[in-house]
Amino acid sequence: MKFFLILGFCLLPLIAQGKVFQRCELAAAMKKHGLSNYRGYSLGHWVCAAKYESNFNTAAINRNRDGSSDYGILQINSRWWCNDGRTSGAKNLCKISCSALLSSDITASVNCAKRVVSDKNGMNAWVAWRNHCKGRDVSQWIRGCRV
């Protein structure tokens, strides 16, 4: 029994960690989940946002000065979009646990991102997108990808 307990603790980091996508792999996954031209934003915009938000890492978590945190490949914020159980006054507009956004399966992140971008601010909700992708040629982010 002790052996299995130790084995479980050793394997937990492997099970719990997310995934770091390759650029074209992420582009294909995002396209499969319907982000290509979603709300008028090309696939290049989504891949660019993911690069600068999380470096394509689904397990990324970053704390903000206001006490909220950003989660997952698109760094979805706990103040507005998900519930992390510790952000006071959180709205949880995606009606999802923030931990669900850390999965190697990006379905939850994409579904919540669709909700975020449907808001009046669109992709302006993502600071990294505003700073690195908005108004720029983002075709480089899908160049050479079979999407």
UniProtKB/Swiss-Prot annotation:
Tissue specificity annotation: Expressed in liver and ovary. Not expressed in bone marrow, lung, spleen, intestine or oviduct.
Superkingdom classification of source: Eukaryota
Signal sequence annotation: 1-18
Catalysed reactions, semicolon-separated: Hydrolysis of (1->4)-beta-linkages between N-acetylmuramic acid and N-acetyl-D-glucosamine residues in a peptidoglycan and between N-acetyl-D-glucosamine residues in chitodextrins
SUPFAM superfamilies according to UniProt: Lysozyme-like
EC number: 3.2.1.17
Annotated residues for binding of substrate: 119
InterPro entries linked: Glyco_hydro_22, Glyco_hydro_22_CS, Glyco_hydro_22_lys, Lysozyme-like_dom_sf
Swiss-Prot/TrEMBL GO biological process terms: defense response to Gram-negative bacterium; defense response to Gram-positive bacterium; killing of cells of another organism
Function (record text): Lysozymes have primarily a bacteriolytic function; those in tissues and body fluids are associated with the monocyte-macrophage system and enhance the activity of immunoagents. Has bacteriolytic activity against M.luteus.
Subunit structure: Monomer.
Protein name according to UniProt: Lysozyme C
